[in-house]
Amino acid sequence: MESMSELAPRCLLFPLLLLLPLLLLPAPKLGPSPAGAEETDWVRLPSKCEVCKYVAVELKSAFEETGKTKEVIDTGYGILDGKGSGVKYTKSDLRLIEVTETICKRLLDYSLHKERTGSNRFAKGMSETFETLHNLVHKGVKVVMDIPYELWNETSAEVADLKKQCDVLVEEFEEVIEDWYRNHQEEDLTEFLCANHVLKGKDTSCLAERWSGKKGDIASLGGKKSKKKRSGVKGSSSGSSKQRKELGGLGEDANAEEEEGVQKASPLPHSPPDEL
C-alpha cells in the first residue's frame, strides 16, 4: 500500500485540475454596467470644443460690457512732482483681472436644451421642454417625473461640468487670453483662443455651429410681432398724415371760398354822381 506521504501530492493535484478551466476563462472587462452606460448616454458632458466656444462667447460679452466706460484709474503719485498718473480702465490690468475672475460663473446662467443638437444644446434661458412642463403645471395639470418639481430649475450636470472645465481652461490659457487682450483685440477671440491654441490640431467643428431658431420659436415670433407692430404704427401714422392732408385741403378750400366771398362782398357798387 502507498503511504500517506505519497498520496498527498495526488490529492492536491486533483482540485487544481478542476480549477484550471476557470483560470483559463477571459477576464471580465472593467467598465460601467449596462445601466451605467445608459446613464452616461443620458448625461453627455461638454466637449473641450463646447467649453472653449462658450468661454470665448462670454469673454467677448464681458469685454464689450466693460468697454463702454471712460473711467481713468489713478495709478499713484509721482515722487518728484506729486502728480498722479492715470490709465484708462479699458486698457488696464484691472479690467482683465475682473473679467477673467468672474467669467466662468456666467456659464451657470446657461441651461441644457436637450431638444437641440450639437453645441447649441447649451443656451441661456429655459429649455422648450421645461417651459412646456412649467406651463402645464401652472394650468393645473399633474406632471409626474423622476425629477422632483423643486429641482427642475437646478443646474444640470452638464452645465456644472461646463463651469468646472472653464475654470481649468482659463487658468491653463491665462497667458493666451492676456496676449489677445494686450496685442490682438482686432482678431476674433474665438478664432484666436480656441482654433489657434486650445483646440489646435483637434476637432473645431462646434465653433461654426449656430442656432438659427425654428418655426414656433419664441424669439423668432417675438421678432415678427415687433415688426408687425412697427409697420402698423407706420401705417397708422401715414394714414393719419394722409387724413391731415385731406382735412387740410378741405380747410384750404373752405378758407379760399370764404376769402372769395369776402372779396366779392367787399367792393361796393359806385353810386352815380349826384347831379347838381
Swiss-Prot record:
Signal peptide (UniProt feature, chain positions): 1-26
Location within or outside the cell: Endoplasmic reticulum
Family: Belongs to the canopy family.
Organism: Mus musculus
CC terms in the record's Gene Ontology section: endoplasmic reticulum
Intrachain S-S bonds: 49-206, 52-194, 104-166
Gene Ontology biological process: innate immune response
Superkingdom of this protein's organism: Eukaryota
Protein name: Protein canopy homolog 3
Classification of source organism: Eukaryota, Metazoa, Chordata, Craniata, Vertebrata
Result of changing residue 145 to K: Loss of HSP90B1-binding
